[in-house]
C-alpha cells in the first residue's frame, strides 16, 4: 500500500491537487469584481477586463481543483506499467539526401515568403496589432495624441473579436518588444510588421521539420521529400506561413500532435503523452476554432487504444490518454476561462451566417490543394486571380491537376485503411474536416475557406502516405507530378502575394499625411483624417472616427473652420452600403475628390481615399 502511495504519479497529482486547493483557500474571491461585472451587465455594458478576468480566473481555479481530484482518482489506472508498445511500427529515418531536399524546400519557402514580412498589415492583422501589441493611442479633443503601452491583460485576454490568437499573440509581442525600437522621426514606423510576422515565418519553416518527424514516427518517411518540395510552392505557405495571425502555429502544432500521438501509442512513455496534452492546449490557446482537429484525433486515439488485443496495454494506455486530456482541459480552463463569455457572444452575433453551396466546396478544394481559389472573387480587381480563369496554364490543365492531386490523396486514404495499425487514422484525416463542415451546416454558417487550415496537414500526410507506398521509380514520377502540379497551379497567387500587400493600409495613410508617426511632435497638425468602419487603425490613430453622416458633416465643418485639408480613408465599400447616407456623401464629386483606389487581395481589403473639396485649396 505504501509503495503505491509513493508512486511518482500519485505523488505528483496529489501535489498538484494540494497546490491548487491551497491557492483557492488563500486567494480571496474577487467579490468586488463580481459586483462590478454584474452592474455593467445589468446596464447592458461590456465588463472591463480589469474586473472580468479575475472573476473567470477564480472560477477556472475552482473547476481545476475538482479536475485535479479526478487526476488523483485515476491513479489505479494511470499508474499501471506499459508492458509493451500499444502500436506497432518503429520510427523510420530519412536519408541524408532526403533531408537535403527537405532543407531545400524550406529554403525555397523562406525566399518566397520573406518579401511579405514588411508588407502593410491587413485588416485582421492590424486589428490584432492595434488592440493587443502596439502602444495605445488616445486622440484628444484638441487633435493631440496621448500614447501609453498596451497592458498585458489586453494581450492575454482581449477577445472582443476572435482576431486575438492568444498563444501566437504573446509570442508576437515578445518578438516585437525585443526587435522593435520606436523612433520620433516623421515617417518612422509606429510598430514593426516584420517583428510580429517573424515568429510565423519561423513556424512555417518548422512545418517541414514537423512533417518529416511525424512521418518518420508513423513509418511514412519515403514520401516526405517530394511532398516537402510541393509544400514549398503552395500559396497557403506564402500566405499563412507569414501572416501575423496564429494559423502558421496551428499547422505546425497539428503536425506535432499527430507525431506525438504516434510516439505515445508506440512507447506509452509519459513524456509523449504529456507532450501531446501540452500541444493540444497550445493549439486551442492559439485558435479555439481549431477544436475539430483534436476532437477527431482523440477519437482516433481511443479507437487505437481499445483495439489493442492486450488488456493490460489497453488499460495502461487508456489511463495515460485520459490524464493527457485532463491536463489539456486544466490548462485550457486555467488560462482561457476569461474568453468564454466573449467567445459565446461572438458566436451569437453570427458574423459568418450563410450556407455552403457548390461554389464554396469548389473554392475550398482548390484552396486546400494549391492555395488559390477556383473562382474569381472580384471583377476588375487585378489581384483577383483564379485557377479557372487566371492561372499560369489553361483551365483544362488546372482541372486535371486538381483531380489528380485529389486522386493522390485518395490513394493515401486507401493505403491507410489497408494497414491494421493505421486503419483508424481516417477518423482524423477525413473526419476532422467533415466534422467542421457538419458544424458549419448545422450552425448555418459560411466559414472562410482558410478555416480548413487545421486540416491542411492531413492533406499533406495523405500525399506522403500515398507516395510512401510506391516503388522507387513510381514514387519519384508521382512526386515530380505533385511538385509540378502544386507549383504551377499556385504560381500566380503566390506571385501576387509576394508583390503587394493584401490590404494597402499603410500606403493609404501615406496619401493623407506627411507625418505618419504619432510619436512626432507635429503629428496631426495641419491635416485632418477621418474614418469609420474598416478604418486604418493603428496606421492612423489620429483619424477622427464618425458613425453617421451627421458626424461626418461635423468634421467637414471643423475642417472648413480650421482651414486644413480633410481626408476620409475607408475600406470595403460593401460594408459602407449599410451606411447609404455616408456613402452618397463620399461619392458626391461636388464635395469629395477621389485621391486613390488601392485594390486589395481579398474581397474586403480594397481601400479608398477621398479629399474634402471644401478644404482642397488649403
Model-predicted regions and their roles:
Residues 80-88:
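Charged, often flexible domain-edge or linker segments that flank or initiate folded functional domains
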Residues 103-107:
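Thiotemplate assembly-line natural product biosynthesis machinery
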Residues 87-97, 317:
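Interfacial transmembrane-helix boundary/kink motif in multi-pass membrane proteins
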Residues 2-15, 93-101:
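N-terminal membrane topogenic signal
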Residues 6-17, 21-81, 109-477, 483-614:
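Membrane-proximal helix-loop-helix interfaces that form the catalytic/acceptor-binding platform
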Residues 616-618:
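Short, solvent-exposed mixed-charge patches
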Amino acid at each position: 500500500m505504501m509503495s503505491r502511495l509513493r508512486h511518482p504519479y500519485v505523488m505528483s497529482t496529489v501535489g498538484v491537487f494540494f497546490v491548487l486547493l491551497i491557492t483557492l483557500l488563500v486567494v480571496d474571491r474577487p467579490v468586488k469584481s463580481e459586483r462590478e461585472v454584474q452592474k455593467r451587465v445589468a446596464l447592458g455594458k461590456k465588463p472591463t477586463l480589469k474586473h472580468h478576468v479575475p472573476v473567470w480566473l477564480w472560477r477556472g481555479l475552482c473547476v481545476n481543483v475538482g479536475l485535479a481530484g479526478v487526476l488523483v482518482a485515476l491513479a489505479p489506472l494511470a499508474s499501471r506499467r506499459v508492458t509493451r508498445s500499444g502500436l506497432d511500427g518503429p520510427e523510420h529515418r530519412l536519408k541524408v539526401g532526403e533531408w537535403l531536399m527537405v532543407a531545400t524546400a524550406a529554403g525555397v519557402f523562406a525566399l518566397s515568403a520573406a518579401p511579405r514580412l514588411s508588407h502593410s498589415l491587413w485588416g485582421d492583422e492590424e486589428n490584432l496589432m492595434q488592440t493587443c501589441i502596439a502602444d495605445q493611442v488616445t486622440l484628444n479633443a484638441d487633435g493631440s495624441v496621448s500614447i501609453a503601452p498596451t497592458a498585458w491583460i489586453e494581450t492575454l485576454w482581449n477577445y472582443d473579436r476572435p482576431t486575438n490568437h492568444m498563444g501566437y499573440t504573446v509570442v508576437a509581442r515578445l518578438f516585437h518588444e525585443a526587435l522593435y525600437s520606436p523612433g520620433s522621426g516623421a515617417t518612422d514606423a509606429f510598430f514593426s510588421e516584420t517583428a510580429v510576422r517573424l515568429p510565423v515565418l519561423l513556424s512555417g519553416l518548422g512545418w517541414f521539420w514537423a512533417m518529416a518527424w511525424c512521418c518518420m514516427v508513423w513509418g511514412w518517411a519515403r514520401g516526405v521529400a517530394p511532398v516537402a518540395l510541393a509544400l514549398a510552392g503552395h500559396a497557403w505557405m506564402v500566405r499563412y506561413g507569414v501572416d501575423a495571425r496564429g494559423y502558421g502555429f496551428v499547422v505546425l502544432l497539428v503536425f506535432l500532435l499527430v507525431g506525438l500521438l504516434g510516439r505515445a501509442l508506440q512507447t506509452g512513455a509519459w513524456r509523449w503523452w504529456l507532450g501531446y496534452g501540452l500541444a493540444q492546449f497550445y493549439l486551442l490557446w492559439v485558435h479555439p476554432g481549431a477544436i475539430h482537429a483534436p476532437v477527431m484525433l482523440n477519437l482516433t486515439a481511443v479507437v487505437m487504444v481499445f483495439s489493442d488485443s492486450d488488456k493490460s496495454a489497453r488499460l495502461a494506455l487508456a489511463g495515460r490518454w485520459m490524464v493527457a486530456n485532463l491536463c489539456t482541459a486544466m490548462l485550457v480552463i486555467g488560462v482561457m476561462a476569461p474568453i468564454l463569455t466573449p467567445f459565446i457572444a461572438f458566436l451569437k452575433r453570427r458574423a459568418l451566417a450563410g450556407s455552403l453551396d457548390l461554389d464554396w466546396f469548389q473554392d475550398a478544394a482548390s484552396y486546400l490543394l494549391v492555395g488559390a481559389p477556383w473562382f474569381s472573387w472580384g471583377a476588375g480587381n487585378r489581384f483577383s486571380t483564379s485557377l479557372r480563369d487566371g492561372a499560369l496554364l489553361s483551365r483544362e490543365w488546372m482541372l486535371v491537376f486538381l483531380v489528380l492531386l485529389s486522386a493522390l490523396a485518395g490513394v493515401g486514404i486507401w493505403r491507410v485503411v489497408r494497414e491494421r495499425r493505421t486503419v483508424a487514422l481516417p477518423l482524423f484525416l477525413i473526419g476532422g474536416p467533415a466534422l467542421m463542415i457538419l458544424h458549419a451546416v448545422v450552425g448555418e454558417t459560411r466559414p472562410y475557406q482558410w478555416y480548413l487550415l487545421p486540416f491542411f496537414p492531413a492533406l499533406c500526410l495523405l500525399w506522403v502516405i500515398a507516395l510512401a507506398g510506391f516503388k522507387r521509380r513510381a514514387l519519384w514520377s508521382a512526386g515530380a507530378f505533385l511538385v509540378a502540379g502544386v507549383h504551377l497551379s499556385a504560381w500566380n497567387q503566390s506571385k501576387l502575394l509576394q508583390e503587394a500587400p493584401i490590404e494597402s493600409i499603410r500606403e493609404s495613410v501615406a496619401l493623407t499625411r506627411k507625418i505618419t508617426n504619432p510619436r512626432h511632435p507635429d503629428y496631426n497638425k495641419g491635416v485632418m483624417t477621418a474614418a469609420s468602419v474598416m478604418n486604418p487603425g493603428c496606421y492612423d490613430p489620429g483619424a477622427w472616427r464618425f458613425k453617421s453622416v451627421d458626424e461626418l458633416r461635423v468634421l467637414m465643418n471643423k475642417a472648413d473652420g480650421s482651414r486644413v485639408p480633410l481626408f476620409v480613408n475607408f475600406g470595403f465599400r460593401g460594408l459602407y452600403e449599410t451606411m447609404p447616407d455616408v456613402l452618397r456623401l463620399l461619392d458626391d464629386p461636388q464635395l469629395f475628390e477621389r485621391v486613390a483606389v488601392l485594390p486589395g487581395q481579398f474581397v474586403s481589403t480594397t481601400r479608398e481615399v477621398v479629399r474634402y473639396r471644401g478644404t482642397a485649396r488649403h
